[in-house]
């Protein structure tokens, strides 16, 4: 019954609807709607098609060469090789005129819009040759520039931020050096402390938790310190080590500064090799980037001493780039067939490189002047297996260590080469003399290490068997062959570390942790022979007054820390630091005083001795007074704590007696104590009476 009633009611409603009037939804005449389409249908209008749809991934390349049809394929090959480095190109159009000659521009479509943006960023203003520099834009830029408003609006004035003094560390009146100590507190979390090496105890300047993920590195002049992070690297400076600049390069593993601190090079891995980016330090702008096939050796770029040029070695060539444009010098590489290595002079725009033996042509060491590309000296070498180039820091000498062989053995396919009867030569180039004469020193024993005296005319070598080697010192003088001045026999050292000021040298065995301090002007006497078990690093301070040896947790996990010595080997500080990883002295910029002024100061140095000694005495007296005050304060604190505990113990006596059966046990054994007086000799003095 209920169902039937419902059906009847439904039918009645249907019949009534046939006679109802339709509602009117039209606006009355003169009605004005105050609601805009954007307010009413904003979500739908955002999805409406636009004129730029489908062309976000298209770039326009202008200023390409205008070539005939015969040369078009070669042009396409060159341009496609450049632009395919930034993504997959799905379509390319080169408009041509009636004669089939290109019009000087092209359209390229990438698979993704982000790839097109990257290509514009990297290749705009790219110099193809002397007459053609690309102008690369997104296709959508035309619409952007068409819609520029006619009324100019002034830019918002940004508040000027006063930057801290980046060179405050060299303004210290007592010229104390600074150093940083890094310790790992967790995985990918390194704490870095900055200290000033004042006497009698170093002073802590700043400590930063989680300052870097791996390690830190100072810039060559000590202005900046660089830290490593997942997104890239950052540089810090100033009195409180504020962030100066950051450089986005994910996965950066290594960085290097240009000598004058104008540029920074970052090395980061890619799926197929490495990406290297050169940055402008002051602006943070990317100047140029390179993609290296395979895992290239770190530090593949070499800078000139004045930051005017940077070079890298290619296959049978050297690529030299000018700054700040970073275009190739004269727009072309220097072709050098068989080149194996090169190095810049530390003081002049001179490149030294060596070429291997080829088809009965001897190996060759060449000095080339840049930017003239003029060869100023050549030296032919025979039976050469390898060469190493060692410049003296002052640029006065170049030593080429030549590994030579008596016999060469090859297999049938020349795939495996063995050198027999090895011996070694040192070719010494006198850079400051006319026509650059070359002297030769032959060593028949295995060479384990080589080191120039930074300021002076001596070099040292470790030669012989690794477990029982000899250390020889040679002196280089004008017009005569380098002479052996001293040989220290049966020394188990592996590395040589000269003082930055010369004269003193540390002979180190970084396997056993033993060190010997030698004065090269006093008959090469060993002044001290300390040891630091498992030490893996040696660091001289910039002034040559202190030496630090360190045991890093990168090598071992126990007994990590560092020791500090004087230049004569006297220990002055031992520091045990858990998870210690790194110790670095802060470099100093070169002095602004002329050589004449420096000579004058050295000549009259005795005049300053009295003032220096008085200042040292006052400092030590002040330090002693501070130490006594500190000890007195500690004693007072302890006595206050002790008296408080004694009073508390006395107040609990009644409770103590009750708990012990009403027996006073505090003085139970006092009567059984025996007192014994013991005398022993402390000091004996003998006085002669006349």
From Swiss-Prot:
Keyword field: Coiled coil, Cytoplasm, Initiation factor, Protein biosynthesis, Repeat, RNA-binding, WD repeat
PROSITE patterns referenced in this protein's UniProt entry, alphabetically: RRM (PS50102)
One of the record's GO cellular component terms: eukaryotic 48S preinitiation complex
Repeat (WD) residue spans along the chain: 207-246, 293-331, 334-369, 442-484, 530-575
Occurrences of domain RRM (ranges): 57-141
CDD domains, sorted: RRM_eIF3B (cd12278)
Molecular functions per Gene Ontology: RNA binding; translation initiation factor activity; translation initiation factor binding
Compartment(s) of residence: Cytoplasm
Stretches for region Disordered: 1-36
Any Pfam family hit: eIF2A
Ranges of compositional bias, category Basic and acidic residues: 1-11
Known role: RNA-binding component of the eukaryotic translation initiation factor 3 (eIF-3) complex, which is involved in protein synthesis of a specialized repertoire of mRNAs and, together with other initiation factors, stimulates binding of mRNA and methionyl-tRNAi to the 40S ribosome. The eIF-3 complex specifically targets and initiates translation of a subset of mRNAs involved in cell proliferation.
Complex formation: Component of the eukaryotic translation initiation factor 3 (eIF-3) complex. The eIF-3 complex interacts with pix. Interacts with mxt.
The protein's name in its UniProt record: Eukaryotic translation initiation factor 3 subunit B
Lineage of producing organism: Eukaryota, Metazoa, Ecdysozoa, Arthropoda, Hexapoda
């Amino acid at each position: 019954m209920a169902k039937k009633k419902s059906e009847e009611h439904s039918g009645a409603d249907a019949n009534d609807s046939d006679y109802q009037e339709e509602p009117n939804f039209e606006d009355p005449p003169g009605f004005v709607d105050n609601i805009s389409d954007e307010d009413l249908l904003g979500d739908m209008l955002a999805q409406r098609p636009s004129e730029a749809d489908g062309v976000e991934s298209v770039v326009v390349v202008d200023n390409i060469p205008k070539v005939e049809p015969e040369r078009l394929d070669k042009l396409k090959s060159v341009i496609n090789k450049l632009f395919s480095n930034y993504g997959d190109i799905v379509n390319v159009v080169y408009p041509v005129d009636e004669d089939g000659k290109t019009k000087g521009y092209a359209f390229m479509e990438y698979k993704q819009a982000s790839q097109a943006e990257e290509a514009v960023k990297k290749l705009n203003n790219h110099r193809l040759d002397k007459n053609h520099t690309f102008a690369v834009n997104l296709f959508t830029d035309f619409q952007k520039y068409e819609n520029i408003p006619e009324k100019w609006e002034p830019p918002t004035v940004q508040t000027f931020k006063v930057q801290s003094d980046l060179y405050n560390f060299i303004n210290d009146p007592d010229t104390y050096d600074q150093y940083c100590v890094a310790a790992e507190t967790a995985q990918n979390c390194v704490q870095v402390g900055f200290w000033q090496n004042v006497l009698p105890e170093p002073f802590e300047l700043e400590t930063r938790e989680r300052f870097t993920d791996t390690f830190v590195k100072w810039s060559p002049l000590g202005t900046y310190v660089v830290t490593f992070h997942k997104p890239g690297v950052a540089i810090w400076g100033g009195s409180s080590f504020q962030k100066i600049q950051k450089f986005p390069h994910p996965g950066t593993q290594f960085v290097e500064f240009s000598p004058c601190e104008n540029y920074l090079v970052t090395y980061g891995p890619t799926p197929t090799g490495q990406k290297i980016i050169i940055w402008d330090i002051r602006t943070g702008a990317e100047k140029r980037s390179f993609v290296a096939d395979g895992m290239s050796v770190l530090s593949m770029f070499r800078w000139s001493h004045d930051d005017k040029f940077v070079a890298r070695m290619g296959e049978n060539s050297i690529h030299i780039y000018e700054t700040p444009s970073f275009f190739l010098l004269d727009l072309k590489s220097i072709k050098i067939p068989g080149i194996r290595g090169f190095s810049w002079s530390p003081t002049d725009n001179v490149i030294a490189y060596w070429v291997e033996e080829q088809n009965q042509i001897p190996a060759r060491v060449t000095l080339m002047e840049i930017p003239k590309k003029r060869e100023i000296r050549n030296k032919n070498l025979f039976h050469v297996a390898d060469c190493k180039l060692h410049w003296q820091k002052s640029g006065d000498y170049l030593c080429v260590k030549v590994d030579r062989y008596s016999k060469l053995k090859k297999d049938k396919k020349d795939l495996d080469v063995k050198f027999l009867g090895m011996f070694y030569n040192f070719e010494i180039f006198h850079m400051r003399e006319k026509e650059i004469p070359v002297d030769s020193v032959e060593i028949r024993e295995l060479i384990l290490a080589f080191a120039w005296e930074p300021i002076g005319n001596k070099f040292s070598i470790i030669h012989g068997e690794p477990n029982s080697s000899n250390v020889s010192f040679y002196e280089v003088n004008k017009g005569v062959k380098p002479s052996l001045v001293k040989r220290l026999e049966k020394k188990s050292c592996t590395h040589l570390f000269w003082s930055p000021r010369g004269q003193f040298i540390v002979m180190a065995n970084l396997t056993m942790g033993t060190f010997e301090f030698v004065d090269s002007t006093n008959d090469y006497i060993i002044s001290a022979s300390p040891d630091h078990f498992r030490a893996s690093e040696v660091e001289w301070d910039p002034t040559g007054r202190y030496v630090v040896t360190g045991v890093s947790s990168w090598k071992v996990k126990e007994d990590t820390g560092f020791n500090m010595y004087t230049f004569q080997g006297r220990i002055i500080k031992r520091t045990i630091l858990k998870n210690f990883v790194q110790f670095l002295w802060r470099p100093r910029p070169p002095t602004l005083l002329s050589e004449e002024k420096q000579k004058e100061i050295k000549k009259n140095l005795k005049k300053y001795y009295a003032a220096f000694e008085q200042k040292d005495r006052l400092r030590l007296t002040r330090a002693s007074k501070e130490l006594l005050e500190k000890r007195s304060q500690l004693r007072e604190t302890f006595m206050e704590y002790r008296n408080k505990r004694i009073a508390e113990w006395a107040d609990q006596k009644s409770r103590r007696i009750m708990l012990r059966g009403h027996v006073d046990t505090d003085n139970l054994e006092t009567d059984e104590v025996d007192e014994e007086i013991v005398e022993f000799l402390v000091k004996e003095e003998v006085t002669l009476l006349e």
